[in-house]
Amino acid sequence: MSTVLTYIRAVDIYEHMTESLDLEFESAYRGESVAFGEGVRPPWSIGEPQPELAALIVQGKFRGDVLDVGCGEAAISLALAERGHTTVGLDLSPAAVELARHEAAKRGLANASFEVADASSFTGYDGRFDTIVDSTLFHSMPVESREGYLQSIVRAAAPGASYFVLVFDRAAIPEGPINAVTEDELRAAVSKYWIIDEIKPARLYARFPAGFAGMPALLDIREEPNGLQSIGGWLLSAHLG
């Protein structure tokens, strides 16, 4: 359920967003978003893992069974499954889960499964996962849901599990509708449950529709190779003691 919603034209996004981000995500995955355009793929669905997380895959940081929480179209789950990991992706959007399942079936990845679930209250995976990855979910949930979310993923984590979070920096996106974080805010929330190894500056990538224009000047947006754009964020690495 990751998002690049605040990249969108400032006026349009506030006029057309519903009161619930969950509904906006669902319409985006169905190709029915007013903000992005009819039939347009969500900008955050770039067809591959976020580059910051792809680098961790290459470095061998992902171990054992992997939980992709807020998986969206599940690019990282699918990439890890192709490397032999058993992956489970959870997302609140039924449309996103259906897209992920379809792609897994297309690639013949029986070791990648997906379920509709609320990240702040899911159960049924106690002590299972060696690695948990949050690819831009953290800023997409209400602040009041963070405690339930962190409790849920700790419950699902195996002893010594690793946890990776890619999240927007509040300095790059100072206003809603999402809940970007400062480094201190991220550290304070996560350190209640995990031993933090590192929080470092990162970039979050998106691909905008052809002809898209008018992004807010205040955002730290960079043009990247292959038609992508990026904005500032944080990459957190942590583990269970």
Curated annotation (Swiss-Prot):
InterPro entries, alphabetized: Methyltransf_25, SAM-dependent_MTases_sf
- Print the miscellaneous field: Is dispensable under in vitro conditions in both axenic and macrophage culture.
Query: Which molecular function term from Gene Ontology is one that the record holds?
Result: methyltransferase activity
Question: What are the transmembrane regions?
Answer: none
Keywords, ordered alphabetically? Cytoplasm, Methyltransferase, S-adenosyl-L-methionine, Transferase
Q: One GO CC annotation, please?
A: cytosol
Domain of life, per lineage:
Bacteria
User: According to its UniProt record, which protein family does this protein belong to?
Assistant: Belongs to the methyltransferase superfamily.
A Gene Ontology biological process noted in the UniProt record is: cellular response to iron ion starvation
Q: What does this protein do?
A: Involved in cellular response to chemical stress and may contribute to resistance toward antimicrobial natural compounds as well as drugs. Catalyzes the methylation and detoxification of the P.aeruginosa toxin 2-heptyl-1-hydroxy-4(1H)-quinolinone (HQNO) to 2-heptyl-1-methoxy-4(1H)-quinolinone (HMOQ). Can also methylate 3-bromo-2-heptyl-1-hydroxy-4(1H)-quinolinone, and shows much lower activity with 1-hydroxyquinolin-4(1H)-one, quercetin, 4-hydroxyquinolin-2(1H)-one (DHQ) and 4-hydroxyisoquinolin-1(2H)-one.
Q: What is its main location?
A: cytoplasm
EC identifiers of the protein: 2.1.1.374
Query: Mind telling me what this protein is named?
Result: 2-heptyl-1-hydroxyquinolin-4(1H)-one methyltransferase
Disrupted gene: resulting phenotype? Deletion of the gene has no effect on growth in medium containing salicylate or on intra-macrophage replication. Deletion does not affect sensitivity to plumbagin, menadione, nigericin, PAS or CCCP.
Cellular compartments annotated? Cytoplasm
Q: What induces it?
A: Repressed by the transcriptional repressor Rv2887. Induced by salicylate, during iron deprivation (at RNA level), by anaerobiosis and by superoxide generating naphthoquinones such as menadione and plumbagin and by pro-oxidant phenoxyisobutyrates (fibrates) such as gemfibrozil (at protein level). Part of the Rv0560c-Rv0559c operon. Operon induction is slow but is maintained for at least 2 weeks in aerobic culture in the presence of salicylate.
Q: How does it assemble?
A: Monomer.
Q: Which reactions appear under catalytic activity for this entry? A: 2-heptyl-1-hydroxy-4(1H)-quinolinone + S-adenosyl-L-methionine = 2-heptyl-1-methoxy-4(1H)-quinolinone + S-adenosyl-L-homocysteine + H(+); 3-bromo-2-heptyl-1-hydroxy-4(1H)-quinolinone + S-adenosyl-L-methionine = 3-bromo-2-heptyl-1-methoxy-4(1H)-quinolinone + S-adenosyl-L-homocysteine + H(+); 3-methyl-1-oxo-2-[3-oxo-3-(pyrrolidin-1-yl)propyl]-1,5-dihydrobenzo[4,5]imidazo[1,2-a]pyridine-4-carbonitrile + S-adenosyl-L-methionine = 3,5-dimethyl-1-oxo-2-[3-oxo-3-(pyrrolidin-1-yl)propyl]-1,5-dihydrobenzo[4,5]imidazo[1,2-a]pyridine-4-carbonitrile + S-adenosyl-L-homocysteine + H(+)
